[in-house]
Amino acid sequence: MATMDLSSDLVEEILSRVPARSLVRLRSTCKQWEALIAEPRFVNKHLSHMRYREQQFTVFNNEHIVSPLFGSTTSYVGIDFNKPENCGVKLPFPIALSPAINISHCDGLLLYVTKSMLLVANPLLSQKRWIKCSEGFDHSMDAYGLGYLFNQSSGFYDYKVVRFRCGIKNSSRVEVYAFKSDSWKVVVDTNFGGFDGLPLSSVCLRGTPYWLGYNKSGNELMSIQSFDFSKERFEPLFLPPQSIGSRNLVKYISLGIFRGDQLSLLLECHETCKLHLWVMKKQHWSRLMTVDVPQDAIYGKYFSSFIERNGRLALLIKSRNISIYIGGENQEFKRFEYFTGLGPMLSDCCYIQSLLQIPGFSR
């Protein structure tokens, strides 16, 4: 049977909707595909599709599998709502030297904070790049964000890292690292008050990092802060009404990304023991869902949450093991258990696989 030649535009459109993991396997089968898949323009187009469709992972560091020989091993838990009973995916990604104290994510790139250095990695492409920390580095009190700004002259994104000091007794020193120049610089932002401790949660949306934490002012109120890399300054974001209060009113609260392009907030009230999911739409918070906390999950820790297209909420909860709860407003949560007997988790974040090359990476 004769084969049909497809136009290059149609081939590109088809490949841009293929999961990243499959494209990595396919790129060696055709030189033209390999060249296309490596193009920054195609990578950005593919990522824009995958933000809505790609399988999401929660990345966490397991303290029990840290060894002097192999360093720290990072594990991944995959979520597949179509087959939740088989959604546990454990993919080790060895990291040399000390274990990661904190992990954050931006478009398929992971930023690991260790006791002495920073590591940026794309596990799917087996790429990593170490970043030397500037003077005064303190992993116990420094918060980080990975993001980017669009470079008008080159037509590409310039990836950067922002770092700021937390703590009531510390000045809110802010520094920005540029991959392009491989250097840090101090940024002065007199309007940024800072957090009284490390942020409770952080995410990156369209290149802008966001953090949720308690204000340094001493009033025990929470706030959301974002960092604009183009203006090199922090910008506050107001919270939903139910989350404005002291530490005693909110039992749990966390930032998330809803369907790839909207900021979300999950909180549990102390009094009602109900979970409320809020989504930011056009600079206004809208409550999307309210559910009862699963009874056997009351004493666990929520790692991350996100919504699948049919309106189900997924909770990853850590107690003595990792459990996944899937449910909605009018349905009971179903529990799926994974990875029993794990040790303490040092850090975690949500992660989407991508074909994005680490800036400045060389083998």
Curated annotation (Swiss-Prot):
Question: What are the ranges of the Kelch repeats?
Answer: 158-207, 209-254
Q: Answer whether the UniProt record assigns the keyword Glycosyltransferase to this protein.
A: no
- The UniProt entry annotates LRR repeats at 221-246
The keyword Disulfide bond appears for this protein: no
Q: Which SUPFAM superfamilies match?
A: F-box domain
The record's listing under NCBIfam families reads: F_box_assoc_1 (TIGR01640)
Protein name, as recorded: Putative F-box/LRR-repeat/kelch-repeat protein At1g11620
* Record-annotated membrane-spanning stretches: none
For this UniProt record, the keywords arranged alphabetically read as follows: Kelch repeat, Leucine-rich repeat, Repeat
Report the InterPro entries cross-referenced here. F-box-assoc_dom_typ1, F-box-assoc_interact_dom, F-box-like_dom_sf, F-box_dom, SCF_F-box_component
> Which PROSITE patterns does UniProt cross-reference here?
FBOX
Q: Source species, please? A: Arabidopsis thaliana
The source's superkingdom equals: Eukaryota
- The F-box domain extends over 1-50
